Every structure is written in C-alpha cells, then in structure tokens.
Amino acid sequence: KRNPDKRVIFINYSAVDPALTNDKCNFWHFRFDANADIKMDAITDVIAGVPSIKKMYLIGQDYSFGKAVAAAAEKYLAQKTSIEIVGNELHPIGKVKDFTPYARKILASGADGVITGNWGADMVNLGKSLSESGYKGPVYCYYCASNGITATFGEAGKGMLHLVGEGLQNPSRP
C-alpha cells in the first residue's frame, strides 16, 4: 500500500493465523503452510481416535495465533468428540520463563491431553515444566519438533509429542 507501483509478493513461511487468508486476505500474500484451522482439523481427527482422552487442556500464547488455535480446538473437539475442555489459558508471549504454575494447573485439572500452539522458548519452557511436573499425557502441538524442544522432552517425549506440520518430519535427535 505504501508503494502501489512497486508491488511485492509477501511469501509467508510460518504465520498460520487463518485471518491472513480469510478476512485479512491480500492478493499479494502467499502462504506455504496450512493455517491453524486446517492443522487443528487434522489434530482432532487423531484425538477423536484416542478413546482414553476424556479431558483436554488448551494452553497458548496470547496473540492472534494462540487465540486462533484455541478457537479451532474448541470448534473441532466439539464437532468430533465428547471431550471436556478443562482449561483454556493464554499466557504472555515470550515473557514466561517458568511454566511450573501452568503445569500444576494442567495436572490439577485432570487433563488427559494438552493442545498448544506454543513455539520457541515458550514451547521449550512449557515442555520442561510439564516433564519436571510428572505429566505423562500426550501433547498435541504445531511447533514441537525443533531440536531444542525435543531435547527438552528427551526420552520422555517419545510417544508424548504429537505434531502436525510441514517441512522436515523428524528432528535430528530425540
């Protein structure tokens, strides 16, 4: 909009807020990755096939993407399952260093599973707190396959982390 005679395509490799291809769509925006709704549709297909999950805890970063993940989780869990959402919490993005209080809430809620869109340091710190708290249930996530995150979970992450994503499918080490 600043230079209408010098158009540039915006090649978006990671922002998956559905608004970018819906109500805030722009002809010059191109996204490689599936949006948060499409990814949650896939995640909840998997969750619907796990009869032991009766209660789910949603936790995410407090910005448009985190809110989109929570809204999609609520929508698709309600459509496909009878799973009760026992927590739906947003935290300040990049500001929480110790997720122990959140991990304690997750444990106290009796959640059988966790859904998060967290990425980066927030996912590493959430994973660390979940592991240290003794949480053993599945974590369904969008961005939990980078080496720092898988290293944080270590061996405990095998069978615990469930990812929907694009690109490289396996991190270089557990």
What does each model-identified segment do?
Residues 1, 13-20, 116-124, 141-150, ...:
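Ligand-binding clamshell of periplasmic/extracellular solute-binding protein-like
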Residues 1-12, 22-24, 109, 128-137:
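Extracytoplasmic "Venus flytrap"/periplasmic binding protein-like
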Residues 10, 32, 56, 160-163:
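Structural signal for hydrophobic
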Residues 10-13, 72, 87, 141, ...:
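General beta-strand structural signal in soluble alpha/beta enzymes
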Residues 17-19, 27-134, 169-173:
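Extracellular/periplasmic Venus flytrap/periplasmic-binding protein
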Residues 20-21, 160:
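Short clusters of hydrophobic/aromatic residues that line enzyme substrate/ligand-binding pockets
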Residues 21-22, 103, 151-153:
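Short glycine-biased active-site loop of nucleotidyltransferases that positions the nucleotide triphosphate
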Residues 26, 130-174:
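Extracellular/periplasmic periplasmic-binding protein-like sensory domains
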